[in-house]
Design a protein with these regions (language model features):
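Active-site loop segments of alpha/beta catalytic cores
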Residues: 1-30, 59, 93-337
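Helix-coil boundary/capping segments in enzymes
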Residues: 33-108
Length: 337
């Protein structure tokens, strides 16, 4: 009898289209999951929430000043340390790659590797974003202007940030991660945030370098990217991305996504968080899961299940989350028998 796949092997088989024994899962239903999702710590805020002239403000470790008026935990950025990108050589990055912030990850991986069924260890890079990481410290409008007014300075800063990300990749490889994960939202609701030509000029060379480096170190590359991104999926796959994590699909269409990159890019997705999970019935959720597997998961793998990490914020009920989990488990071998 053929030995049962470990969770680690199952995830690798799914994302490389090598016929896993079932779809891998990362679900909040208390049953067996296949991924150990490892987030790192980081430096404290430069200044915690405090009242200043009637406003609640804080300054994060990147030097961004945030304001909140309603008592929320996030607030809105109101001041950026690199509003003028021509001053970027004076900017000092936070100490995100300090080994102390990886200690918990190292210990979890050691413990995981002792298991008879080790999970796939997915490490989130402390420097996990090139696009968002840049506009977070510049301000989005300032970054949009810099593409045209200060392209050389913008490229130089992105290169510095990419070098920090490469350090994160090496540390996570040394810790024993199977994959590394980044975050770059490239889409608005119905179109890309910027043109493909700008992404190709400013970001693809850096992605290619860092993703190739991760592959050389024996790891897969995962990236969260929401919004209307389907027009970029094949490009990202050719550049070296293995898995894209998307919380919405219906703004693009499952069949359109599959036609664009099915079989060359794997997908880590819940049921669409904006439409079916909000306005659909239990039966709609079941049908959507089945359809997702019959499209994105039909390539000897290619799909991993998950649930949205902040369900209360988007109005997902306990009943609908349970229905989604049940459907993913029910159809986990669909197309793989």
């Amino acid at each position: 009898m053929e030995a049962k796949m470990t969770s680690r092997d199952r995830v690798k088989a799914a994302i490389h289209f090598k016929s896993p024994d079932r779809m891998p899962h990362f679900l909040p239903d208390g049953k067996e999951n296949d991924i150990l999702w490892l987030w790192q710590g980081g430096p404290s805020d430069i200044q915690n929430w405090h009242e200043e002239n009637g406003h609640m403000l804080r300054t994060d470790c990147w030097g961004v000043v945030w304001e909140t008026k309603g008592g929320g935990s996030y607030g809105e950025a109101i001041s950026w340390p690199l509003a003028d990108i021509t001053t970027h050589t004076n900017y000092t990055f936070p100490d995100q790659n300090n080994p102390i912030y990886f200690e918990a990850t190292v210990n979890q991986i050691i413990e995981n590797n002792r298991s008879d069924n080790p999970k796939y260890c997915l490490g989130v890079m402390p420097f996990n974003s090139l696009n968002e990481g840049t506009h977070n410290v510049m301000g989005l409008e300032n970054m949009f202007a810099a593409y045209y007014e200060c392209p050389d300075d913008l490229k130089a800063f992105l290169s510095r940030l990419a070098d920090k990300q490469k350090e994160s990749i090496k540390i996570l490889a040394d810790a024993g991660c199977d994959g590394v994960m980044g975050y770059d939202d490239w889409g608005l609701q119905d179109r890309q945030m910027v043109s493909t030509s700008l992404i190709e000029e400013f970001f693809i060379p850096l992605y290619k370098s860092n993703w190739s480096y991760a592959h050389e170190l024996g790891m897969d590359v995962w990236m969260h990217s929401c919004g209307y991104t389907v027009s970029l999926h094949a490009l990202f796959a050719r550049t070296g991305l293995n898995v894209i994590q998307m919380d919405q699909q219906e703004n693009m269409g499952l069949e359109i996504i599959d036609a664009a990159a099915g079989g060359i890019l794997a997908y880590w997705c819940p049921v669409d968080v904006q439409k079916t999970m909000v306005g659909g019935t239990i039966e709609d959720i079941d049908a959507y899961v089945k359809r997702m597997i019959e499209t994105l998961g039909r390539h000897k793998g290619g799909l991993i299940s998950m649930a949205y990490s902040s369900p209360d914020a988007v109005g997902h009920t306990t009943e609908k989350i349970a229905a989604m989990c049940e459907a993913f488990r029910k159809y986990e071998r669909l197309g793989l028998e």
